[in-house]
Amino acid sequence: MANKWRCSIALAVLSLTGCAYIPQKPLVEGATTAAPSVATAPVPNGAIFQVVQPVYYGYQPLFEDRRPRNIGDTLTITLQENVSASKNSSANASRNGKNTFSAALTPRFLKGLIGGDKTDLDMEAENTFGGKGGANANNTFKGTITVTVDRLLANGNLHVVGEKQIAINQGTEFIRFSGVVNPRTINANNTVSSNQVADARIEYVGNGYINEAQNMGWLQRFFLNVAPF
């Protein structure tokens, strides 16, 4: 019997320990890089003009720039995100009521309780409610990340994805990015601002003891969920 209680307590502790980790769904899912498929070399046919290989296999026209246009090409994203928002709300409600009741004659069975032959009854009620709320948020994210073209859309836009990992002491920082780039917005130095990327997904997370110290413990989260006040 004692062994059963010990096993039950151990299972309960393990279950609560499992609640200590809060899984976070990543914004950028799937592979964070892409590479062109290997093409077979053309067979010489003896003609003067041979069929050239595609651009992403080494061939580059003389008068064309080096902007990405094929799967596997790289592009540098300049992260320039400044987001600020504020919200204020207030509400006031007030209600007053007054009722007066009087009777010239008091029932016999109430004379001993309230005395006299005349009964006066006054009732007053007052309710007042006031509430205010406000929220402010200001986020700034600056940096650079080089991404890879992993998909070509039918209208010529490029779907890009990339990841950067930075290991600092005992923690690792991850920067993930994905979005749709219009080739016309790419600069001559092969960069584009994140403000000009459609459907942008920017994720900056980390792991290690510093990141764990910023999370609330499982016991604190338990009491926070069940506390009625």
Swiss-Prot record:
Which region is the signal sequence?
1-18
- List, alphabetically, the Pfam families matched: FlgH
Q: Which residues cross the membrane?
A: none
Recorded GO CC terms: bacterial-type flagellum basal body, distal rod, L ring; cell outer membrane
Q: Where in the cell is it found?
A: Cell outer membrane; Bacterial flagellum basal body
Can you locate the S-diacylglycerol cysteine lipid attachment residues? C19
- Enumerate the PROSITE patterns for this protein: PROKAR_LIPOPROTEIN
Which terms does the UniProt entry file under GO BP? bacterial-type flagellum-dependent cell motility
Task: Quote the residue positions with lipidation, kind N-palmitoyl cysteine.
Answer: C19
What keywords sit in the KW lines? Bacterial flagellum, Cell outer membrane, Lipoprotein, Membrane, Palmitate, Signal
Membrane topology, as annotated: Lipid-anchor
Q: GO molecular function terms here?
A: cytoskeletal motor activity
Q: What does this protein do?
A: Assembles around the rod to form the L-ring and probably protects the motor/basal body from shearing forces during rotation.
Identify its protein family: Belongs to the FlgH family.
Q: How does it assemble?
A: The basal body constitutes a major portion of the flagellar organelle and consists of four rings (L,P,S, and M) mounted on a central rod.
Question: What name is this protein filed under?
Answer: Flagellar L-ring protein
This chain's source organism reads Photorhabdus laumondii subsp. laumondii (strain DSM 15139 / CIP 105565 / TT01)
**Which gene name belongs to this protein?**
flgH
